[in-house]
C-alpha cells in the first residue's frame, strides 16, 4: 500500500425488523463504501464502525438494543476510535434516551436521515460529541444515496416511506413519518440499474406500498398498478413482488394488474391483523372482514393459482373467544399459506396502549399456538399439492444445507432445492419437477432451464 492510499476501514451492520430495514442497511453499506471506502465485515470485533438498524414493532425493542450496545461498550473501551451508531425506528422514537443511557454511542439517526451518515461521522470526528439527527426531511434521502450494488438475482427497491393510516396499535407513522412516494423516474432508474447488474426479480417496498402515488416527469401522478406495468417492461426484470400492503389501498386497478402483467408473481402478502369486525374497528383498520375477503376473491379470480399470506395480532385488548374464532374462520376460508403472527404488545404513544387488557397471557399464548399450527398445516397442504407439478423457479445459488444442490424460489415463494452441478444456472430460470414436500422447502429434479437451446 502506497503512502497516499487510505487504509480500508471495516463496517459492521446489525439489522433488526422488516425488509425496509434490510434495504436501508444495504444502502448504508453502499453509502459508506462510496464515501469512506468502507468494506463490510461479519465480525464486530474487527470493525471500525458498528451500526445497529433497529425496529420498534415488537415489545422490549429498547431493552434488546441496550443489551446489544452493552456488548459493544467493551469494544469501545479497547478501541476508543471505534464509532458506534444507532439507526432505525427505535432511534427515531428514543433518540434522547439512547444518548443518555448509552453515552458511548456516537451517532443516532432515523430512517429518513441515514443518507447523512458520512457528514455525521465527520462531525463526530471533528468535535467529539454525540451526533443526533432523527428529523423527517421528506424523501431527501433517496436523492443523496448512491445507486445500489446488486447482491444476487433478487433485489429490494424502496418506492415510498412512512404510513398515514394511524392504526391504533402501530408506531410506524410516529417513527417513519407520513407517506411520501419517490418520483417515478427515480424508481425506474434504480430498477434499470439493478437489471443491468443481472437482477431478475424486484421486490417493491413500502410500509404501505400500495398507497404509492409517485410524480411522473409530466406532472401526472402514477399509482402502484401503473408503476408495476412500467417495471414489467424493463428488459431483464421477469418477476415483480411488492410488500407490505394495506387492504384499504388495494384498488380495482391493482387487482386488474394480476390479469394483465405476468411478471407480477402469484403470491400476495396482505396483512389483515384480525378476522373480527369488532377488533378491526378497534384497531382503526378502515375495512370489514367481508371487504377484505371480497378483494382476495377478486384477485384469485384473475390469478387462480395465487397464494396468500397475512399478518395477525393475537390478544389485542378486548379480544374474546368469539373474536379469535372469527380470525380462525378467516384463515380457513382464505387458506392462508404463511403468516407473521404474534401476541399484541402495547407500543408507547399509540392509542391502543391505553386500552384495558384483561386477557390472561396464557390464553394469548394458547391462541397464538393454535393459529400458527393451523397456518403450518395449510402451508404443508399447499406444498403437498405441488408435488408432481413442474414449477418454474429463479435459481439464486447453492442450497444452504447441501452445496451439491442448487436452490431457488417458485412464484408463490416456496424454496426449491434440486441436484445440479452447473453453477452457470445461478441467476437463471429453471423448470423443476417437484418430488417431495418438506416442512420449509420442496425438493425436485431439473427438467429444463434457460441454458437449454429450446427453452421457452
From Swiss-Prot:
Residues 384-448 form the TRAM domain. GO terms for cellular component: cytosol. Its EC number is 2.8.4.3. It comes from the Bacteria. It is found in: Cytoplasm. Residues 149-381 form the Radical SAM core domain. InterPro entries: Elp3/MiaA/NifB-like_rSAM, Methylthiotransferase, Methylthiotransferase_CS, Methylthiotransferase_N, Methylthiotransferase_N_sf, MiaB_methiolase, rSAM, rSAM_horseshoe. Residues 9-126 form the MTTase N-terminal domain. Its cofactor is [4Fe-4S] cluster. Its main location: cytoplasm. Binds 2 [4Fe-4S] clusters. One cluster is coordinated with 3 cysteines and an exchangeable S-adenosyl-L-methionine. [4Fe-4S] cluster 2 binds at residues 163, 167, 170. It catalyses: N(6)-dimethylallyladenosine(37) in tRNA + (sulfur carrier)-SH + AH2 + 2 S-adenosyl-L-methionine = 2-methylsulfanyl-N(6)-dimethylallyladenosine(37) in tRNA + (sulfur carrier)-H + 5'-deoxyadenosine + L-methionine + A + S-adenosyl-L-homocysteine + 2 H(+). Catalyzes the methylthiolation of N6-(dimethylallyl)adenosine (i(6)A), leading to the formation of 2-methylthio-N6-(dimethylallyl)adenosine (ms(2)i(6)A) at position 37 in tRNAs that read codons beginning with uridine. Belongs to the methylthiotransferase family. MiaB subfamily. Monomer. PANTHER family: CDK5 REGULATORY SUBUNIT-ASSOCIATED PROTEIN 1 (PTHR43020), MITOCHONDRIAL TRNA METHYLTHIOTRANSFERASE CDK5RAP1 (PTHR43020:SF2). This is tRNA-2-methylthio-N(6)-dimethylallyladenosine synthase.
